[in-house]
Every structure is written in structure tokens, then in C-alpha cells.
């Protein structure tokens, strides 16, 4: 199987040609429902109802599950949509806001049980549908943006986050927690010492141990060993990552840091990362920078050209 390649094809058809249990990780962000029209036959996101949209994505990701290794991980970025009247809405897809990246769509955006102006709940509808299709739903990560796209709404808070779901094929899977661990603040380290200085003999703040005499006897009086104090903690599920503009396309892309975090945690070094909605190639760029291989699938030939320009060529 060739890697470090970009496949210009419908994602479902392309996935069907890849071997079973061959890919370590998927990091992707499919087109959001009823926000943009990219002028492509078979494009996802232009369905008449959310139910049809979700059904198509479940079919794509069902095929993804086949090619994913048993220990593989699937990181899915998805945002929500409001029910509307069919007029062009003011909300802009943060990944593709203007120009060459499609036109605003005029879809009624009706959903069973939803009224006009209701938030549809696309992320959770999709997550539950994927769980019903056999995926393990392991985490709902909030991607919080300090620089979100502005909205003109005056009767609700402006949106500044999206979901990143971690799903897996099996109960046991590759996950490198240490690779994305967060540093502990100095104030937290001080709490571990109970306010004592680093040369204190005892600490009552080592979790689960009560008063513990220092194992390090380098000084005759003994002192508290800083090696007992953790310097990192398990990464939390709110990630503060700004969007990053891409000057070549005049739009904000899926941030490299977001893709890199998913890849570091979910794909071993030298492994293969796939993105069936490759867009301008951020997942491939991140995979390459981290010593992983990539496979990108993209329906739009213009995006394929953008991705190749960003990544700097392909193998094979």
C-alpha cells in the first residue's frame, strides 16, 4: 500500500480499495452540514436532512473501521448547525469561509423534532450513530478557540468551540498519554509539598501515601525528593487551540496543532495516518512533521493541488 499520497476521489470509493487492518490512525474533519456548496457531485454536507447527512458519514466511517487496525484510533472534528428557513445563513464554516471554498447554501436545515432556530445537535447525533455502528466512543474533546469566526447573532452567545470525538475500533488501542501530557503549574507542585520548601524531610501531600520519609539520603538530615513530585498531568479534554489562517487559500484551516495532538496520542512513530476529507492537507502536514506516514483522500481537485503545495510532494 502506498503512503504519503493524495487520492483525488470520492472518499467511500477510495476507502473500499484499501486493505483491511492497515491504518493506525484517522484524523479528519468532514464538511459541516448545510453550510457550504463546493460545486462537486457526491459532496457530503448538501443533503436535504441531517439524518441523510449522518447516514452518509456513518457509511464512510464504517469503511474506515474496516481499514483501521484493531489498535487504531479515530479522531473526528465536527461542529453543529442550527435549523433555519432555507435562506443563506450568517454562520460561516470556520474551515472554509469564502471565495474559492464554496458558496453559502440555502438548505432548509430541518430535522425531526427541531423547530426553526433550534440547535440540531449534529455532533452528538453522529457520535451516537457511530457508537450504534460498533465504534467505541471514548472521549468528547472540546476544541476551544480564542479567535473564532464572528457571528451576527444577538439572541445567544457566539460559538467558540467544536467537538473532537475520540473513537476506537476495539477496547484496547494505542494511546500515548505521555506524548501529550500537560505540565503541572508551580502552584500545583507547591501543594504536593504542603507548602514546604524542597529541603523538607517529610511531605504529607504525596497522593495515597500520607507522610512519607524522603528516600533520598544525600544529606545527613534528609530532604524532600523533588523526583517524587509529578511534573506533568494527563491531558484534559478541553483544548485551547487557535485557528490558523492559510495565506495560500485565504481561509482558516484545521489547525496543525490540533492534528498534531491527535497524532501524537493516537499513532505510533512510523505509523500511517489517514484523512478521508483531506482538504488543504493539514493532517498530512502534521503527520509528516511527526515522523508518520499519511494517506489523504479529497474529492476536490483544487484542494488536492493546495495540499500538494503545502506538504511538498508525494511518494510513489
Give the label of every model feature segment:
Residues 1-316:
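Core catalytic lobe of class I
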Amino acid at each position: 500500500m502506498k503512503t504519503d499520497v493524495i487520492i483525488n476521489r470520492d472518499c467511500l470509493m477510495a476507502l473500499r480499495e484499501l486493505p483491511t487492518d492497515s491504518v493506525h490512525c484517522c484524523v479528519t474533519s468532514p464538511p459541516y452540514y448545510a453550510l457550504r456548496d463546493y460545486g462537486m457531485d457526491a459532496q457530503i454536507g448538501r443533503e436535504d436532512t441531517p439524518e441523510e447527512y449522518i447516514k452518509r458519514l456513518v457509511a464512510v466511517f464504517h469503511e474506515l473501521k474496516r481499514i483501521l487496525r484493531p489498535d487504531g484510533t479515530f479522531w473526528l472534528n465536527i461542529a453543529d448547525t442550527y435549523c433555519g428557513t432555507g435562506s443563506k445563513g450568517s454562520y460561516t464554516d470556520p474551515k472554509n469561509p469564502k471565495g474559492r471554498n464554496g458558496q453559502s447554501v440555502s438548505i432548509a436545515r430541518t430535522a425531526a423534532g427541531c423547530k426553526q432556530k433550534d440547535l440540531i445537535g449534529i455532533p452528538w447525533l453522529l457520535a451516537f450513530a457511530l457508537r450504534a455502528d460498533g465504534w467505541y466512543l471514548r472521549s468528547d474533546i472540546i476544541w476551544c478557540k480564542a479567535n473564532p469566526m464572528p457571528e451576527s447573532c444577538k439572541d445567544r452567545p457566539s460559538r467558540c468551540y467544536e467537538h473532537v470525538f475520540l473513537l476506537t475500533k476495539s477496547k484496547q488501542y494505542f494511546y500515548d498519554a505521555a506524548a501529550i501530557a500537560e505540565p503541572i503549574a508551580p502552584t500545583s507542585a507547591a501543594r504536593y509539598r504542603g507548602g514546604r520548601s524542597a529541603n523538607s524531610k517529610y511531605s504529607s501531600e504525596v497522593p495515597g501515601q500520607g507522610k512519607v520519609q524522603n528516600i533520598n539520603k544525600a544529606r545527613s538530615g534528609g530532604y524532600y525528593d523533588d523526583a517524587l513530585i509529578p511534573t506533568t498531568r494527563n491531558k484534559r479534554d478541553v483544548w485551547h487551540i487557535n485557528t490558523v489562517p492559510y495565506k495560500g487559500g485565504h481561509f482558516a484551516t484545521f489547525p496543525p496543532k490540533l492534528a498534531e495532538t491527535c497524532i501524537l496520542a493516537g499513532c505510533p512513530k512510523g505509523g500511517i495516518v489517514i484523512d478521508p476529507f483531506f482538504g488543504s492537507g493539514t493532517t498530512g502536514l502534521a503527520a509528516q512533521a511527526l515522523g508518520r506516514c499519511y494517506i489523504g483522500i479529497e474529492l476536490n481537485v483544487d484542494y488536492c493541488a493546495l495540499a500538494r503545495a503545502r506538504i511538498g510532494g508525494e511518494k510513489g
